[in-house]
From Swiss-Prot:
5-amino-1-(5-phospho-beta-D-ribosyl)imidazole-4-carboxamide binds at H27, S94, N255. It comes from Methanosarcina barkeri (strain Fusaro / DSM 804). The keyword Magnesium applies. Residues 101-333 form the ATP-grasp domain. It is an enzyme of class 6 (ligase). Pathway: Purine metabolism; IMP biosynthesis via de novo pathway; 5-formamido-1-(5-phospho-D-ribosyl)imidazole-4-carboxamide from 5-amino-1-(5-phospho-D-ribosyl)imidazole-4-carboxamide (formate route): step 1/1. This is 5-formaminoimidazole-4-carboxamide-1-(beta)-D-ribofuranosyl 5'-monophosphate synthetase. Pfam families: DUF1246, DUF1297. It catalyses: 5-amino-1-(5-phospho-beta-D-ribosyl)imidazole-4-carboxamide + formate + ATP = 5-formamido-1-(5-phospho-D-ribosyl)imidazole-4-carboxamide + ADP + phosphate. One of its GO terms (biological process) is 'de novo' IMP biosynthetic process. Belongs to the phosphohexose mutase family. PROSITE patterns: ATP_GRASP (PS50975). Keywords: ATP-binding, Ligase, Magnesium, Manganese, Metal-binding, Nucleotide-binding, Purine biosynthesis. Gene3D superfamilies: 3.40.50.20, ATP-grasp fold, A domain, ATP-grasp fold, B domain.
């Protein structure tokens, strides 16, 4: 991984009054470019081949310029060119997925957030250690598939967007569906309502919901629309579907807005606070936007089954603000909040606290 000291050396040559915000043209890039422009930054979209035509349909979110590469791996060879433009990369889910964790960790361009979180987020065992260490309630883990005696969710390491997940109720079903060439985790299947909670942690803001260092914000929340799980049961009962050779899949195709009962907000903030505080001790803290992927049970317990330590696509619902963000500032998206953090850090000489 590129060192923090190397990144700080790059920053010494930056014109901090002319920073460029860049990301790969995918995932939440429209929101990121829109938010950066609203905060006065120049924007750069990175794409393979011809720039996507759909950006022409959204002029407020179209990047000011494109960096066209032959492959995503070729981005590594463009580091000097990006640094000459005073670029700060905003990582989203596709950036890490397309570049790969090793390339992303080694990319010689200042990046928003703490890249050290990758080690803890991408390994499900370390992720579980982190969350349990924070006192978070998680679904039970099944170490031996022979011990499956009820519904479980099986996840392959690195599975994103709902791909690489399946549900099994018995060892026999598990054996029928498992790909043993991949590392996997078996979790208890929790019944309830899924909520994806979108937070923002600032190490440089010391007002609002303050922590031991910095402050925590709740910007929004969503629920994912999954194919074919959300519609499949129109065809019959689970037993009838299995008998017909049809099994649910969980590929994310979109997102739906949600709000939570106000009485649950103290617990929601407590979850975010504990996760951030634990991260400060483990790897110096995650920075910026993150998402706790949860299930709310009928006893109003919240169980966390995963964390995404960067902007998630569910925040795209709220480019013009959310019911929660509006109570802090109107028209505040997660993309704009990221740009605002960079802007304040640059103006106050604190970029070293939010980039890696």
């Amino acid at each position: 991984m590129i060192t923090k000291q190397q990144v700080l050396e790059f920053l010494k040559n930056y014109d901090l009054e002319n920073i460029t915000i860049a990301t790969i043209c995918s995932h939440s890039s429209l929101q990121i470019f829109d938010g950066a422009r609203k905060e006065g930054f120049r924007t750069l979209g990175i794409c393979v081949g011809k720039p996507p035509k759909f950006y022409e349909a959204f002029p407020k979110a179209k990047p000011d310029e494109y960096l066209v590469v032959d492959s995503y791996a070729d981005i590594m060879n463009k580091a000097e060119e990006l640094r000459q433009k005073n670029t700060i990369i905003i990582p989203h889910g596709s950036v890490v997925a397309y570049l790969g964790t090793e390339n992303f960790a080694d990319m010689a361009v200042p990046t928003f957030g703490n890249r050290a979180v990758l080690e803890w987020e991408s390994d499900r065992d370390k992720e579980r250690e982190w969350l349990l260490g924070a006192g978070i309630h998680m679904p039970g883990k099944v170490d031996d598939p022979h011990d499956i005696n009820g519904p479980v969710m099986v996840k392959y390491d690195g599975a994103k967007g709902g791909k690489g997940f399946f549900v099994a109720k018995t060892y026999e079903e598990f054996e029928e569906l498992i790909d043993r060439t991949q590392k996997y985790t078996i979790q208890e299947f929790i019944t309830g309502t899924r909520y994806y909670l979108h937070y923002f942690y600032s190490p440089i803001r010391n007002e609002g919901y303050t922590l031991s260092k910095g402050s925590l914000e709740l910007l929004s929340m969503d629920r994912r629309v999954e194919s074919n799980a959300d519609e499949i049961f129109r065809l019959g009962s689970p037993r009838e579907l299995v008998g017909a050779g049809i099994r649910p899949t969980y590929v994310v195709t979109g997102n739906m807005p949600l709000v939570a009962r106000e009485s649950l907000l103290p617990l929601i903030f407590s979850l975010g606070e504990r996760v951030v505080e634990e991260s400060l001790g483990l790897f110096g803290g995650m920075i910026g936007s993150f998402c706790l992927e949860t299930v709310f049970t009928d006893t109003l317990e919240i169980k966390v089954f995963e964390i995404s330590a960067r902007i998630v696509a569910g925040t795209n619902l709220y480019i013009s603000g959310s019911p929660y963000a509006d109570l802090m500032e109107e028209n505040l998206s997660t993309g704009r909040r990221i740009a605002r953090e960079i802007k304040i850090a640059a103006q106050t000489g604190q970029l070293d606290k939010i980039i890696s």
